[in-house]
Amino acid sequence: VHLTGEEKSAVTGLWGKVNVEDVGGEALGRLLVVYPWTQRFFESFGDLSSPSAVMGNPKVKAHGKKVLSAFSDGLNHLDNLKGTFAKLSELHCDKLHVDPENFRLLGNVLVVVLAHHFGKDFTPQVQSAYQKVVAGVANALAHKYH
């Protein structure tokens, strides 16, 4: 991902204030509610029968934290996202058979959640930088697909 120095500062500055557990759980939960067909990858998580069940599900929250921890690692390697996410790309492609479009959807949901959490601090410039990052991460995660 090519970011200007200003964009990198905006992304890392805001990310330093992110509660990975809260934002990760909310982002994954929203993905599962807004795009219910994504729930098929999480059948082992138990009750996903309603929006409140999804948003209150501890396994959704835990996996959301795991997802955002990996995203956080990617922010430290913006110049090598494909390398950073190579193993996760392989896992999601070969073993889990996740549709790579879901990575793009989750990235967009993450941007919504960040905007919700940070309000006025999530300026159009910050959003623009984050859109580049989530697109880059989605592309890196889709890299191993044939």
Curated annotation (Swiss-Prot):
Alphabetical list of Pfam families matching this protein: Globin
Domain Globin per the UniProt entry, residue ranges: 2-146
One GO cellular component term noted in the UniProt record for this chain: hemoglobin complex
Keyword Lipoprotein on entry: no
Record PROSITE patterns: GLOBIN
GO BP, one annotated term: hydrogen peroxide catabolic process
Chain positions found as S-nitrosocysteine: C93
Tissue spec: Red blood cells.
Family: Belongs to the globin family.
Subunit structure: Heterotetramer of two alpha chains and two beta chains.
PANTHER family in UniProt: HEMOGLOBIN FAMILY MEMBER, HEMOGLOBIN SUBUNIT BETA
Name assigned to this protein: Hemoglobin subunit beta
Organism: Loris tardigradus (Slender loris)
Taxonomic path: Eukaryota, Metazoa, Chordata, Craniata, Vertebrata
Gene: HBB
